[in-house]
Amino acid sequence: MLLFLSVPQPRPPGARTRAGAARLVRWRRRQRLRLLQLRRLRGLLRGLRRRPGTGGRRPSRMALCGQAAGAASLPSELIVHIFSFLPAPDRLRASASCSHWRECLFYPALWPQLRICLRVSPAEQPRLEFLMRKCGWFVRELRVEFAAENYLSGGGGPGDGGSGGGTDTGTGGEDGEALQLSSRWLEVLRIYLELVLCVLLSIRNNRNLQKFSLFGDISVVHQQGSLSSTYLSRVDPDGKKIKQIQQLFEEILSNSRQLKWLSCGFMLEIVTPTSLSSLSNPIANTMEHLSLLDNNIPGNSTLITAVELERFVNLRSLALDFCDFTAEMARVLTDSNHVPLQRLSLLVHNASVMLKSLDNMPNDEHWKALSRKSSSLRVYLMVFDIKSEDMLKILKPSIPLERVHFDSYVTCVSGAIVDLISRQYDKFLTHFILMNDMIDTSGFPDLSDNRNEDPLVLLAWRCTKLTLLAIHGYTVWAHNLIAIARLRGSDLKVLQVTEESIDFDQGELADQDVDPVQNLIEQVSLGLGQSWHAVLDIESLSVFTEPNRHFYREMQSFSEDI
């Protein structure tokens, strides 16, 4: 209300003549009308602040409805202005009370950006269709994440688990469970394709789009082998839907007039090697961010070539599969007509390394040239199950590596690799994540085996800019954890170590006077200068349960932080 009441009031016009007296009457009438509108608006805002069940004298709905409140008579511009100050829940509550207010809910000024996280389920489709029908044609920033529900862990219904006896029953139960699991994934993919089509159809003619981001977390791609030859071919046997999705994506790119941010990660065959050619030269020349990550492209084909990259002269951040980032691309990015690249995110996946060669990757001289071109260049590396010998080829000394995330299912990271990272990237490294999901009855691997010093302690000692350290699935000795906390102190903002990864020396366990767990918590908290405790539930760590999504979101914030 202060915003409206603080407007200076005009002085009444002179009334010395008959015309002046008439002007004075009209002025007073306008002032009375204006005061009445302000009183109505004050009551309306009081009603918005009320919540149901608070015991107010009047329900908030009465302040919004009816002729007494005058809500329907307020101009649309004023309603939109009021909406702009309200949080989303209050905005929806207000719009539900009056048809005139509902009409103003989806004004373009109120929805400059739209960020949607969808479960791949039938219930989401009508909601998505409604929202995209209202906002898809004008929204400037659109980020959509598709999250598949955990169909792999639910098992079957009653009767699937071998409740009867005998060998034949057991075999039949296994076959039935596999069949049910297959039908679940077929349903997931069918709905997924429908949701993607809904999004793309709604924005095909949106020429205001500036940021467009798509993320599809369909884990069946990595867990069940080649999707194209199994599930996807059964859901879309003639390939019509996939072709329609690819054509719509290219149509969006060709129609864009203001696009500066394009990001597509872990989607199913949406981006093709010819998709970027749909971008006009003026748009490609002004693009600031481009990320094309693990889009399930069969064979050894790539989504972007060095020749195509030459058009993106204004690129400030780039995210690609590591095997697609070649020495020729590094040379293109160092050309004088390109602005300095400031953020580079690279995904190293064992599936890509097996299909594509590492022979074309940039050498140390290329990395030196990139660093000379841009002193602020920083690199984010996400590594899935890469052997130590391949990592030794990848980790060139001149990479300005700021973040590294290891996620292992088969191949563990060695202590030698951790030691190499701490020596080569001590001036840059801020984030270090070690995740291991291997099932090994012999226990977690110990990085400090046959070493005088623990590599993790050396990492904390050498890397003075380290702010985040997360570990699961590797043995971390309690005394080493205390040393890490003391070395980095309050500069280490995040220290996440799972309880099952922590081990104690026999001497610490033998001391009857001290509780080793409580002592560890106290010493680490003292070293960090803040309260600390181990992660008790590994399922609460999204970096472990959803590594793809975690990397994609971190890549987005990493690229925006320029």
Swiss-Prot record:
GO BP terms in the entry: protein ubiquitination
InterPro entries (alphabetical): F-box-like_dom_sf (IPR036047), F-box_dom (IPR001810), LRR_dom_sf (IPR032675)
PROSITE patterns: FBOX (PS50181)
Keywords linked to the UniProt accession: Ubl conjugation pathway
UniProt key word Transmembrane: no
Residue spans of biased composition, Gly residues class: 155-173
Region of interest (Disordered), ranges: 155-176
Domain F-box: 68-114
Source superkingdom: Eukaryota
Span of the signal peptide: none
Keyword Disulfide bond: no
Metabolic or biological pathway: Protein modification; protein ubiquitination
Subunit field text: Part of the SCF (SKP1-CUL1-F-box) E3 ubiquitin-protein ligase complex SCF(FBXO33) formed of CUL1, SKP1, RBX1 and FBXO33. Interacts via its N-terminus with YBX1 CSD domain. Directly interacts with SKP1 and CUL1.
Functional description taken from the UniProt entry: Substrate recognition component of a SCF (SKP1-CUL1-F-box protein) E3 ubiquitin-protein ligase complex which mediates the ubiquitination and subsequent proteasomal degradation of target proteins. Probably recognizes and binds to phosphorylated target proteins. Recognizes YBX1.
Protein name: F-box only protein 33
Annotated organism of origin: Mus musculus (Mouse)
Gene: Fbxo33
